[in-house]
């Protein structure tokens, strides 16, 4: 099966040398909960979404989940921008992590994407 990873823009943020803060589910959900809390407190909206065949569904499989009502769920990671104070921050979060065999491809897409905004 051919793999793919795509980032879809929702809006173009204005950022100045931002820092990337990633919070994905893992041991204890500490990173995920922290980033989600900050996103909620700062009332941020996503500016981009990453979709990939390397992101797992909630049951650990990959692909598309089709609900009983015919709607579907495709796993994604979301980017949020905070530019009210310095340093500007790009938050990355989602409900899943990349597969072991796809983590480098997804990481490469994420890093290439945030470097366009000046992240180092």
Which residues fall in each region the model found?
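Internal, conserved structured core segments that host functional sites
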Residues: 87, 95-120
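N-terminal short beta-loop-beta anion/metal-coordinating cradle
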Residues: 1-95
């Amino acid at each position: 099966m051919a793999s793919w990873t795509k980032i879809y823009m929702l809006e173009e943020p204005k950022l100045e040398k931002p820092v990337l803060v990633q919070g994905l589910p893992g041991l204890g959900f500490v990173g995920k909960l922290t980033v989600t809390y900050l996103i909620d407190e700062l009332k941020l909206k996503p500016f981009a979404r990453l979709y990939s065949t390397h992101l797992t569904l909630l049951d650990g499989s990959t692909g598309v989940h089709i609900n009983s009502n015919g709607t579907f769920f495709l796993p994604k990671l979301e980017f949020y921008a905070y530019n009210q104070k310095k340093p500007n921050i790009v938050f990355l979060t989602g409900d899943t992590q990349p597969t072991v065999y796809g983590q480098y491809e997804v990481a490469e897409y994420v890093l290439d994407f945030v470097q366009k905004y000046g992240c180092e």
